[in-house]
């Protein structure tokens, strides 16, 4: 399920509790300005020593709070879809689909933070702000995420985001051509293709 985490950038700022709270509130309010959007993205994954691990690209559709479709098209195709209840992860290369309840999805993955924009999720982080750049550090060190950063302007448009894992690996995403339009409902529906293995974890 590590690819589920691959979704997610930058900089620091202030330190007082009130400032941290204000930064979190500002980030939430910015993201809340856009309820539905489509964008293409480029991905860069680097190791802890800065060496290039992977370059990729794909498309993203979001309808907050619980609908999204993350389609990685290269170098290997993968699809992550939420229909509002079930989280579907499809890897065509290995012909396998994993299904989990969305309500059980952890709030400590960058992509879930962006799409849900849930107040309870943000409470799990210390948030610092410098202009349009927000840096999030988990209050708990038990998860795989070490740091998450996102750049979002006053209109709610996401420019880029990145996640740094505990081992130092960094996954950076740059969004392009964001269009704040309602996506077709079919983008948020998923039916496992015939012949694939279904790992249903909703039991």
Swiss-Prot record:
Subcellular location: Periplasm
Keywords carried by this UniProt record: Chaperone, Periplasm, Protein transport, Signal, Transport
Keyword Cell division (UniProt): no
GO biological process assignments: lipoprotein localization to outer membrane; lipoprotein transport
Pfam families: LolA
One GO cellular component term: outer membrane-bounded periplasmic space
Gene3D superfamilies: Lipoprotein localisation LolA/LolB/LppX
Superkingdom per UniProt: Bacteria
Signal peptide: 1-21
Key word Glycoprotein present: no
Similarity comment: family membership: Belongs to the LolA family.
NCBIfam families: lolA (TIGR00547)
PANTHER family per the UniProt record, alphabetical: OUTER-MEMBRANE LIPOPROTEIN CARRIER PROTEIN
Subunit note: Monomer.
Role description: Participates in the translocation of lipoproteins from the inner membrane to the outer membrane. Only forms a complex with a lipoprotein if the residue after the N-terminal Cys is not an aspartate (The Asp acts as a targeting signal to indicate that the lipoprotein should stay in the inner membrane).
Record protein name field: Outer-membrane lipoprotein carrier protein
